[in-house]
A protein has these predicted regions:
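Extracellular glycan-interacting surfaces
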Residues: 1-340
């Protein structure tokens, strides 16, 4: 398989040397990649006898993945995890009951902050153009599943984030009828639309997209793109009870976002390569550079105050100076023919 046949779907370097990436190849399948030399070489580290649909790294050694595991000539939905850089994977079979959940066409959203528990949303689009979503929660130490079937949201989910066992947020791409963000305070049993986010007040037409919520040191951030290609941030400092809008907006249809901590975040305008550093818990945006080299990037991850990585579908870039300068990283993927 040639590199032309693959495209990056995510990139998360965790140190200067070690990191994870995901690529998509034929038939929507994903491969999980790992590097030990700063992104120069990547190894395919998929779980054996599996079809990977979604990867979710936690740190330099550990990652979750969702996919289908081949068991007795059957394909069963499973959550995989590794704590040794993908050298070995363990798996838990999801207690699914419906045939559509066993498909490679299922839409998947994951959220985890450690290797002790993980949230999984499986979704499908119905003939009515509405969506059906089933929510799974796994606590690995007890190997106990909590299953919430057909949660009360009918729009397309763009991300799920839990800030503790009970409080969580689902971000949507939808019409402005109520809200693009739903909140639970009972571990996903019920969800309520957040109606007082300031960026959405007074708007009745068009489509908005809320990105997956980011939670860092009590700062809750929901990046939001409005229907008029205006990008902004919604912030909360009290677990989503009250909200503040960023004092900066960007006119763009494409962005990449990363927060290293509650004090340091970045946004790239992927239409023109402008880079903004966000400080003071979101209150101050500083334009640090504009570089056409990083136009079209969609993934962005800073692992400290100065060093970050970005990717578009085919290329990888890194910065060592807060996003002021960027360098293209020449890479190769070892044994990529194994994916055929």
């Amino acid at each position: 398989m040639e590199n032309n046949d693959i495209q990056f779907t995510s990139l998360q370097m965790r140190t200067d040397k070690y990191g994870w990436a995901s690529i998509q190849y034929t038939n929507k399948k994903q491969a999980i990649l790992y590097t030990r030399n700063g992104g120069v070489e990547w190894d395919v580290v998929n779980p054996l006898n599996s079809i990977v649909l979604f990867a979710y790294p936690i740190n330099a050694r550990s990652s979750w993945a969702y996919g289908l595991t081949k068991t007795n000539d059957d394909l069963l939905p499973a959550i995989f995890y590794t704590v040794n850089r993908g050298e070995r994977w363990s798996e838990f079979i999801l207690p699914v009951e419906e045939e559509w959940e066993k498909s490679t066409d299922v839409q998947v959203q994951l959220h985890a902050t450690n290797m002790d528990s993980i949230w999984i949303v499986l979704s499908r689009k119905l003939a009515s153009n509405k969506f059906e979503h089933n929510l799974y929660y796994l606590k690995t130490k007890g190997k106990a599943w909590k299953v919430i079937k057909n949660i009360s949201i009918s729009d397309s989910i763009s991300g799920i984030t839990f800030i503790n066992d009970l409080v969580g947020f689902i971000s949507l791409q939808k019409q402005y009828e109520t809200s693009t963000v739903f909140k639970t305070i009972n571990g996903g049993e019920s969800w309520q639309a957040i109606k007082d986010i300031p960026s959405l007040e007074g708007i009745n037409t068009g489509t908005a997209m809320a990105y997956k919520a980011i939670y860092k040191n009590k700062l809750l951030v929901i990046p939001t793109k409005m229907n008029d290609d205006k990008f902004l941030m919604n912030y909360s400092f009290d677990k989503g009870n009250s909200w503040h809008i960023s004092n900066k907006t960007i006119n763009t249809s494409k962005v990449a976002v990363s927060f290293f901590s509650s004090y340091y975040g970045w946004v790239i305008n992927s239409e023109n390569g402008s880079v903004y550093q966000i400080i003071k818990k979101g209150s101050k945006w500083i334009k640090v550079s504009s570089n056409p080299l990083i136009k079209n990037v969609f993934c962005l991850h800073f692992f400290n105050r100065r060093k970050g990585w970005a990717c578009n579908k085919k290329e990888i870039f890194n910065t060592k100076d807060r996003g002021i300068t960027w360098k293209k990283v020449v890479y190769k993927i070892n044994n990529i023919d194994k994916l055929v």
